[in-house]
């Protein structure tokens, strides 16, 4: 659907077309070995929170790294801490992602973080 809007990169060697944003996110997750979230807007935040939720539910098991350049994600990370403090999330949920300050650190983390077990979904209960 992004091709119809002309929102696609024309210089790619392989362009995967899908019918919806949900299908796009699912396809990206299916093809990925890890997720690195770069600073961005609403779409970036939505995709990051969705993949964290999928990991919490055992639907996505690969590493998730938040690239917190210049503290960009500090407010989001504080919200996560508050969610734990107010018992909306378990303390173990903070291990669903890791945080990097530099691109090199982010790449290193995707290779050092373990793949999660699908039984992680038992932590989905608060």
Regions picked out by a protein language model, each given a short descriptive name:
Residues 43-50:
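Short glycine/serine/threonine-rich phosphate/pyrophosphate-binding segments
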Residues 51-52, 113:
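Amphipathic, positively biased hydrophobic alpha-helical segments used for protein targeting
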Residues 38, 52-78, 91-93:
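Short, acidic/small-residue loops that bind anionic groups at enzyme active sites
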Residues 1-31, 69-109, 114-126:
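A cross-family phosphate/adenosyl-ligand binding-site feature
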Residues 32-43:
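A short, small-residue-rich loop immediately preceding and capping a beta-strand
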Residues 25-26, 48, 56:
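Hydrophobic alpha-helical segments, especially transmembrane helices
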